[in-house]
C-alpha cells in the first residue's frame, strides 16, 4: 500500500531564507510594474521624455507665481 509520509531517511527540502524570499518578491513586483507601465506603448522612452517635459513645464508655472495684472485685455468692437 502507499505511504502518506516520506521515508524517515529523507530530510525536508531546504526553504529559502526570509530575506532572499523578500528580495525575490520585490524584484518580481518591480518587473511586473515595469511591464504594466509599458503595456501598449511602442516607444517607452519618448513617453517618458514627454512626461518629464510636462512635469518641468508645470513646475516652472507653479514657481513663477501669479501672472502680472493686466495680462489679458477684453475688447468689444
Curated annotation (Swiss-Prot):
Topology within the bilayer: Lipid-anchor; Peripheral membrane protein
Q: Which residues carry this modification: Phosphoserine?
A: 46
- Localisation per UniProt entry: Membrane; Smooth endoplasmic reticulum membrane; Golgi apparatus membrane; Cell membrane
**Outcome of mutating residue 2 to A:** Loss of myristoylation. Does not localize to membranes but is exclusively localized in the cytosol. Has no effect on protein degradation by ERAD pathway
The lipid modification S-palmitoyl cysteine is placed on 4, 7
Instruction: Cite the GO molecular-function annotations of the record.
Output: ATPase binding
Q: Where is this region: Disordered?
A: 1-20, 25-77
Q: Which UniProt keywords apply?
A: Cell membrane, Endoplasmic reticulum, Golgi apparatus, Lipoprotein, Lysosome, Membrane, Myristate, Palmitate, Phosphoprotein
Indicate yes or no for the key word Cell membrane: yes
Q: Where is the composition biased (Basic and acidic residues)?
A: 25-37
| Function comment | Negative regulator of the ER-associated degradation pathway (ERAD) of misfolded proteins. It competes with AMFR/gp78 for binding VCP/p97, and inhibits AMFR/gp78-VCP/p97 complex formation that is required for degradation of ERAD substrates. Involved in the regulation of adrenal cortisol and dehydroepiandrosterone (DHEA) biosynthesis.
* Family designation: Belongs to the SVIP family.
Question: This chain belongs to which protein, by name?
Answer: Small VCP/p97-interacting protein
Which organism encodes this protein? Homo sapiens
Amino acid at each position: 500500500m502507499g505511504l502518506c509520509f516520506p521515508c524517515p531517511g529523507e530530510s525536508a527540502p531546504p526553504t529559502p531564507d526570509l530575506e532572499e524570499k523578500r528580495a525575490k518578491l520585490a524584484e518580481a513586483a518591480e518587473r511586473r510594474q515595469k511591464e504594466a507601465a509599458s503595456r501598449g506603448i511602442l516607444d517607452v522612452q519618448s513617453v517618458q521624455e514627454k512626461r518629464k517635459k510636462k512635469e518641468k513645464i508645470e513646475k516652472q508655472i507653479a514657481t513663477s507665481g501669479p501672472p502680472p495684472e493686466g495680462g489679458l485685455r477684453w475688447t468689444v468692437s
